[in-house]
């Protein structure tokens, strides 16, 4: 499906959306976030982590629907990634963006949806569906339920927007979300690689800032990509191409690194070549007289995410080697 957006300032190029998802929201979660419009990045959490979330690709729209009998679509945003995280880490990342005023309130809300209550010492892993650029509709803008959404659907339902039966409903819903007039061209084929558009909300691979941290943690299975360290408090999501240099919050622009390794990477004492092999600068020994932990790993492949699409992009790695790495 191809959309065309119009605003008062510009007539945007076509932007492309192939799917949408409508999730059933907890009423307290929705009301808490609707009262805090400044929270633009939220966690649509799931009380258990057994199932992942593959219904959308990053950048596709995610809408929030209340339970019956209210049964209205009350807002939405753009899918920004999925991660399995302990409750404490989800709270550390997003705080009130989890839909609660405190970590304890978040734990209590999650406990109500689990088969067993959460004991004070437990820190269970939950499913975190990150949504960015969220908007909750005013009372006069809430929409009725989407087509074919059965009352017994518990978590939510995905929709293929290329199907004409759903097109009109979601064009209207999309307009409510982004605040522009929308046209639709059902004859245009979907092509994932399309350009990056003027409205930053519609960039297909961009993650929210906190979602970037969460999905990098999850993709690297909470292990430093260079040392394999698993001590969670010292693990940091590093950008290969930094934001001030034009980098983005993208999973393939990220590495999970121990905090001291992160500093050495940013300063060029360490790098990773486009074949994902560790590079160690001779300057590390010259400047500090040590670094054997890293020289012993030089030339070895780093820890990588399981999915090839999530692994560091060759272009970003080549930039770091050419621009940041201290060759001598």
Set out the residue ranges of the language-model regions.
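Short, hydrophobic/aromatic-rich beta-strand segments within well-structured domains
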Residues: 59-66, 129-130, 224-225, 256-260, ...
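Compositionally biased, charged N-terminal/linker segments
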Residues: 1-61, 66-68, 135, 141-153, ...
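Polyanion-binding interface signature
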Residues: 56, 61-74, 223, 238-241
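Short, structured patches in soluble enzyme cores that scaffold and shape functional sites
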Residues: 132-135, 163, 228
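Short, charged surface segments at domain edges that flank catalytic/cofactor-binding sites
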Residues: 46-48, 183-223, 241-252
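Short, well-ordered loop/turn elements at secondary-structure boundaries
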Residues: 16-17, 57-59, 124-125, 220-221, ...
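Aromatic- and Lys/Arg-enriched surface recognition patch
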Residues: 72-154, 277-295
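A detector for short metal-coordination/catalytic motifs
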Residues: 207, 211, 229-235, 240-328
